[in-house]
Amino acid sequence: MPETQRREVPRLVGDELTTAVSFLDFQREAILRTCEGLTDDQLRWVGVPTGTNLLGLVSHLVDSEFWWFHHHVDGDAWDGDFDMNVPSSVTADEVRQAYRAAWGRSNEIIRRVGDPDALTALPVREQRLPLRWVLSHMIAETARHAGHADILREQIDGATGR
């Protein structure tokens, strides 16, 4: 990815939720920027023995958004599987759109809940967790996968950046 795609880390003064969502959005956008300009074959290219690929990472993050924000925070039913294998019948654009839609809904849930101390609607391993924990976890999870994506992208075409 060209140097022009690098973005500055959010620098804002706001309340806790605004700041956390800004950092999470930054990581979400970083994942999608890493995928820009690649062919379908490149997005599905497996660069490590575990089978991880760029499109699979984005698909996994769709499930993560659903699992944490839609299911645990908001109480929705969940039937995902965290599978990183995207069927060939599913296009890269469909996966990207699903990710944007999932995080858009997640942000709506966060705004509606509005309190970092509010507990999840559904327990995680028999414990209801505060929204603050879920946000912190998702920032870390998304950033970790953004790092994986950076390495895969560099292997594909030498591009680096965030």
What kind of feature is each model-predicted range?
Residues V86-A121, P130-I139, A143:
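Acidic/histidine-rich alpha-helical segments that form the ligand environment
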